[in-house]
C-alpha cells in the first residue's frame, strides 16, 4: 500500500494532481481545498490512501495527516465512499466537520455535493462520540504553524468568486485550474489576484 508520496507537482487538474516521484507520475485525487494549495513545479508531500475496486486502483491524497484521518473515519460510515468523503473535505475543514458532527448539524454536512440530508444524518449517527475535537484542533493548530504561509492572494480570489454567487468548492477548483493552466505560481502575488480572478471567472462561465 502507498501511504505517502514525496515529489514534485507535475500538473493540477480539476480534482487531481499529478505527482512526479523519481520519474514516476502518480495521479492523486484530492480535495479542492488541497488542490488550491498546489501548483506545477512545487515540491510537496502528500499522505495517501489507496482505494482498490473492481474497476480501478485510485490514490486519494491529503496535504495534512489530520485530513487523511478524517477521511478514513468518514469512509467507515455505511454508504459513504471515498468520493463523497473527499467532497466533504472540499466543503468543510476537518475541524468544521468534527464540530458539525458534535453539534448534530446535518445541514452543514449536507452542503457537500453528493451527500444529501440522509447521508449527513447517518454520518452524525455513526461518528458522533468517536471524534476527539481537542485532538483534531490541536493537530490543525500545529499544522498551521509548520506549513507555508497562508496564501492570502488565493483566499481573496476565492472570496471574490463566492461574493459573486459561486460555491466555495467550485471557486477553489477554478482558481487551482486557472493557476495550473497559465503557470501562475502560488502563493499568489498581489499583482496576480485580478488576473486569476478574471481567468477563474472565464472558466466558470464556460460551464464549470
From Swiss-Prot:
**UniProt-annotated stretches for the region Domain II:** 64-142
Q: Which GO terms describe its cellular component?
A: cytoplasm; Holliday junction helicase complex; Holliday junction resolvase complex
Q: Name one Pfam family in it.
A: RuvA_N
What InterPro entries would the database entry show? DNA_helicase_Holl-junc_RuvA_I, Hlx-hairpin-Hlx_DNA-bd_motif, NA-bd_OB-fold, RuvA, RuvA_2-like, RuvA_C, RuvA_C_sf
Q: Gene3D superfamilies per the record? A: 5' to 3' exonuclease, C-terminal subdomain, DNA helicase RuvA subunit, C-terminal domain, Nucleic acid-binding proteins
Report the SMART domains cross-referenced here: HhH1 (SM00278)
Gene Ontology molecular function terms on file = ATP binding; four-way junction DNA binding; four-way junction helicase activity
State the residue spans of region: Domain I: 1-63
User: Has UniProt tagged this entry with the keyword DNA damage?
Assistant: yes
Instruction: Using the UniProt annotation, give all residue ranges assigned to the region (Domain III).
Output: 151-208
| Protein's GO biological process | DNA recombination; DNA repair
Q: CDD domains of this UniProt entry?
A: UBA_RuvA_C
Name where it's found. Answer: Cytoplasm
Keywords for this protein = Cytoplasm, DNA damage, DNA recombination, DNA repair, DNA-binding
Region: Flexible linker, residue numbers = 143-151
Say which domain of life the source belongs to.
Bacteria
Does the record's keyword annotation contain DNA damage? yes
The UniProt entry's sequence similarity note says: Belongs to the RuvA family.
Q: What does this protein do?
A: The RuvA-RuvB-RuvC complex processes Holliday junction (HJ) DNA during genetic recombination and DNA repair, while the RuvA-RuvB complex plays an important role in the rescue of blocked DNA replication forks via replication fork reversal (RFR). RuvA specifically binds to HJ cruciform DNA, conferring on it an open structure. The RuvB hexamer acts as an ATP-dependent pump, pulling dsDNA into and through the RuvAB complex. HJ branch migration allows RuvC to scan DNA until it finds its consensus sequence, where it cleaves and resolves the cruciform DNA.
Domain text: Has three domains with a flexible linker between the domains II and III and assumes an 'L' shape. Domain III is highly mobile and contacts RuvB.
**Subunit structure of this entry?**
Homotetramer. Forms an RuvA(8)-RuvB(12)-Holliday junction (HJ) complex. HJ DNA is sandwiched between 2 RuvA tetramers; dsDNA enters through RuvA and exits via RuvB. An RuvB hexamer assembles on each DNA strand where it exits the tetramer. Each RuvB hexamer is contacted by two RuvA subunits (via domain III) on 2 adjacent RuvB subunits; this complex drives branch migration. In the full resolvosome a probable DNA-RuvA(4)-RuvB(12)-RuvC(2) complex forms which resolves the HJ.
Protein name, entry field: Holliday junction branch migration complex subunit RuvA
Name the species this protein comes from. Bifidobacterium longum (strain NCC 2705)
Gene name per UniProt:
ruvA
Amino acid at each position: 500500500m502507498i501511504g505517502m508520496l514525496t515529489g514534485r507537482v507535475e500538473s493540477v487538474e480539476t480534482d487531481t494532481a499529478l505527482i512526479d516521484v523519481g520519474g514516476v507520475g502518480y495521479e492523486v485525487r484530492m480535495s479542492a481545498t488541497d488542490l488550491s494549495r498546489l501548483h506545477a513545479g512545487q515540491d510537496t508531500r502528500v499522505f495517501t490512501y489507496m482505494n482498490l475496486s473492481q474497476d480501478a486502483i485510485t490514490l486519494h491524497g491529503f496535504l495534512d495527516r489530520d485530513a487523511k484521518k478524517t477521511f478514513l473515519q468518514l469512509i467507515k460510515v455505511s454508504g459513504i465512499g471515498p468520493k463523497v468523503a473527499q467532497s466533504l473535505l472540499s466543503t468543510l475543514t476537518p475541524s468544521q466537520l468534527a464540530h458539525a458532527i458534535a453539534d448534530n448539524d446535518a445541514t452543514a454536512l449536507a452542503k457537500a455535493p453528493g451527500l444529501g440530508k440522509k447521508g449527513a444524518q447517518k454520518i452524525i449517527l455513526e461518528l458522533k462520540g468517536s471524534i476527539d475535537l481537542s485532538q483534531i484542533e490541536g493537530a490543525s493548530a500545529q499544522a498551521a504553524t509548520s506549513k507555508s504561509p497562508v496564501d492570502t492572494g488565493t483566499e481573496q480570489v476565492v472570496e471574490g468568486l463566492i461574493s459573486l454567487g459561486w460555491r466555495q468548492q467550485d471557486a477553489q477548483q477554478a482558481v487551482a485550474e486557472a493557476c495550473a493552466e497559465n503557470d501562475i505560481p502560488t502563493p499568489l502575488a498581489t499583482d496576480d489576484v485580478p488576473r486569476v480572478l478574471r481567468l477563474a471567472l472565464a472558466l466558470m462561465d464556460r460551464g464549470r
